[in-house]
Amino acid sequence: MSQRKLQQDIDKLLKKVKEGIEDFDDIYEKFQSTDPSNSSHREKLESDLKREIKKLQKHRDQIKTWLSKEDVKDKQSVLMTNRRLIENGMERFKSVEKLMKTKQFSKEALTNPDIIKDPKELKKRDQVLFIHDCLDELQKQLEQYEAQENEEQTERHEFHIANLENILKKLQNNEMDPEPVEEFQDDIKYYVENNDDPDFIEYDTIYEDMGCEIQPSSSNNEAPKEGNNQTSLSSIRSSKKQERSPKKKAPQRDVSISDRATTPIAPGVESASQSISSTPTPVSTDTPLHTVKDDSIKFDNSTLGTPTTHVSMKKKESENDSEQQLNFPPDRTDEIRKTIQHDVETNAAFQNPLFNDELKYWLDSKRYLMQPLQEMSPKMVSQLESSLLNCPDSLDADSPCLYTKPLSLPHPTSIFFPNEPIRFVYPYDVPLNLTNNENDTDNKFGKDSKAKSKKDDDIYSRTSLARIFMKFDLDTLFFIFYHYQGSYEQFLAARELFKNRNWLFNKVDRCWYYKEIEKLPPGMGKSEEESWRYFDYKKSWLARRCGNDFVYNEEDFEKL
């Protein structure tokens, strides 16, 4: 009889807990939707919440008493579930109580961005966090599709990423309400989670229905298209395929002799072209000599006499005897002798009596090595082919030659082979932008500072490694800084971010900050507006906009 009565008491209590939680949720929703300026109504709702939570706390104490006994094993899971629901309501009431005790413009309210009283701001924050999570997941999937060379999935992801970034920017700039994003949240989430399923059906016009569809190629500042100007996902894919195909098969522009005579060539590239042109190599007349791209001259591999052309012409030896003659360079004994004689007469080192005999003996001993071989074994051909094809792509290939003039270089050398040590220090009289003019360098690396004088220049900016760091993007620099702690490379990455990219390092939270200055249209009261961004290296690995509560304190930032 007592067991039956206990079961009846448990059922009655669980019914009261269910009703109490429903009443608590209704009051809590009213509190969240109430205007923060209506303090009297919010205080009344707070007292109602307090009354309901006290009832639930009594029920929780009774549930804890029953759980300590062994007579309720069949109801133990149900009692634990209701206990957790009551404790969840207690936590929510604590947050409401803390929110009501916090004054609007107190130090705690200004320094804590999580304390948001405006319901619209709460919705906006939730949607911004949702889009951030979707972008992070899509970026991970995009990297996988790019590694698998899946062009169709890559194009779809690029389209969605571009539109989500546009929505995120509009939300942050208050150009878009969070309600449309909340309405289509399930559709966006469905694509992010199920886009690789075989039965997946894509919602092509989701961003068009939201009124903010853009093309991936357009910038974030572009206004959303309206009416007939809006394009579907299928048309964007077809246009992107048409854009990609000519990029892969773009014809190289021929440069005539007159164009080459008037085109300024960097000293490093000019010396490389002279050394290559001095070596007789088979050149096809139908192939353009070199292509002009990005203000630098790159040589076409098909025009150089490589072991590949040597092997292919050896295969045609029986068909055409005239082609066989191209494989063997002419006798250059006289040319080498004249070069050595010229070096002996012009260089001051050969006139020194202390080194005169030794240098002449050294040149005579190297004479045989400087003469190209008339014939080459197949094994040597294969070794040269593999070595040239696997030659490292040096990032300092455009470094200027600091010697006056080399001795004869009869054998062809890859133009991408490094001609300077990796940490070679340049003298002050050699400018750092020999191969690129000042405007191109500023545009390429995003610099807005003027060229520094020799006194302001330091030794680190004159090393090849520092010049390499100038070519890295922000993701690479941040990766080196956070993952190569205590190394020389970390110092160079920090120096590049601070001096050339204008980022500031905060010693307190160990984050990098960047100040943006946006010019406002006339009539706004002020000409420009400042905003701060920080690099989130802990969660998203993205540069995010700082909140309105961010205060710049110069003492917290490191100075290099």
UniProtKB/Swiss-Prot annotation:
Keywords: Activator, Coiled coil, Cytoplasm, Isopeptide bond, Nucleus, Phosphoprotein, Repressor, Transcription, Transcription regulation, Ubl conjugation. There is a cross-link at K338 (Glycyl lysine isopeptide (Lys-Gly) (interchain with G-Cter in ubiquitin)). The modification Phosphothreonine is found at T306. The keyword Cytoplasm applies. One of its GO terms (cellular component) is nucleus. The keyword Ubl conjugation applies. GO terms for biological process: deadenylation-dependent decapping of nuclear-transcribed mRNA; deadenylation-independent decapping of nuclear-transcribed mRNA; nuclear-transcribed mRNA poly(A) tail shortening; positive regulation of transcription elongation by RNA polymerase II; protein ubiquitination; transcription elongation by RNA polymerase II. It comes from the Eukaryota. Residues 215-237, 299-311 have a biased composition (Polar residues). Pfam families: NOT2_3_5_C (PF04153), Not3 (PF04065). Residues 273-288 have a biased composition (Low complexity). Residues 212-330 are annotated as: Disordered. Residues 3-26, 37-71, 124-177 form a coiled coil. It is found in: Cytoplasm; Nucleus. InterPro entries: CCR4-NOT_su2/3/5_C_sf, CCR4-NOT_su3/5, Not2/3/5, NOT2/3/5_C, Not_N. The modification Phosphoserine is found at S377. Present with 5110 molecules/cell in log phase SD medium. Belongs to the CNOT2/3/5 family. Acts as a component of the CCR4-NOT core complex, which in the nucleus seems to be a general transcription factor, and in the cytoplasm the major mRNA deadenylase involved in mRNA turnover. The NOT protein subcomplex negatively regulates the basal and activated transcription of many genes. Preferentially affects TC-type TATA element-dependent transcription. Could directly or indirectly inhibit component(s) of the general transcription machinery. Forms a NOT protein complex that comprises NOT1, NOT2, NOT3, NOT4 and NOT5. Subunit of the 1.0 MDa CCR4-NOT core complex that contains CCR4, CAF1, NOT1, NOT2, NOT3, NOT4, NOT5, CAF40 and CAF130. In the complex interacts with NOT1 and NOT2. The core complex probably is part of a less characterized 1.9 MDa CCR4-NOT complex. This is General negative regulator of transcription subunit 5. It comes from Saccharomyces cerevisiae (strain ATCC 204508 / S288c). The lineage of its organism: Eukaryota, Fungi, Dikarya, Ascomycota, Saccharomycotina.
